[in-house]
Amino acid sequence: QSNDPGYPFGYTISLCWELRPNNYLSITTSIMHSNSNPIPYADGWHPYFTLGGPVDQYQLQFDADTQLEFDADLIPTGNKIKDERFLQKQSLENIFLDNSFELAPNGKCVLSNQHLQLDVVPDEHYPILQVYTPEHRKSIAIENLSGAPDNFNNGIGLLMLLPNKQ
């Protein structure tokens, strides 16, 4: 429906969660609308993961060498910062994150500890990786996003869905 003042566009969304062999979870989002004009949209997930034990015992690696610069309110400024810390496996001991990174095409993220490994493999429609370590240090948020935070205002990665397209 289009009666939400924060997002006044009607649309239909469907989510398909598919568990495949070898513990592979595939999540597919499909959005469609019948408005006469294109509508803005962005998609992303905000899952928290734990591998058991504190985050300080985890390692993180992902295919990104660029971080989006944030202002004091954690809104992207449009500037980019070189950040190659996670191109190789990096311990998360005493590392606190609340950052957005630009993933390389076909990039992935690997979270591991001495017992488990989690691979997050977003497709090309999710070029932003948001990583957050809460103060309690018992989990980590690894979010694949179609655009940067606040993209309805800053336009970074904002997508436009054409009428009757998916």
Predicted regions and their residues:
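Beta-strand secondary-structure signal
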Residues: 14-16, 26-30, 59-61, 108-110, ...
